[in-house]
């Protein structure tokens, strides 16, 4: 079993946890929580949401 990375916040997902969402074009999204899934479905981008690891990584030096 391998650990996955959340497609929204870049958090780690343990084997057997989280959700897998398959879009109409066949691409697969992995979510660590319903919070990440709902934010993605609302059209938000992880880079612009302050609590995500993606935002923290990009804006580390600023």
From Swiss-Prot:
GO molecular function: rRNA binding; structural constituent of ribosome; zinc ion binding
UniProt GO cellular component terms: ribonucleoprotein complex; ribosome
Record keyword Magnesium present: no
ZnF start-end (C4-type): 6-36
Signal peptide location: none
Biological process annotations from GO: translation
Classification via HAMAP family: Ribosomal_eL24
Similarity comment: Belongs to the eukaryotic ribosomal protein eL24 family.
Protein name: Large ribosomal subunit protein eL24
Source species of the chain: Methanococcus maripaludis (strain C7 / ATCC BAA-1331)
Gene behind the chain: rpl24e
């Amino acid at each position: 079993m391998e650990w996955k990375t959340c497609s929204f916040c870049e958090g780690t997902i343990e084997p057997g946890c989280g959700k897998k969402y398959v879009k109409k074009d066949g691409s697969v999204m992995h979510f660590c929580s319903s919070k990440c899934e709902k934010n993605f479905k609302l059209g938000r981008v992880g880079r612009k949401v302050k609590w995500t690891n993606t935002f923290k990584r990009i804006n580390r030096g600023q």
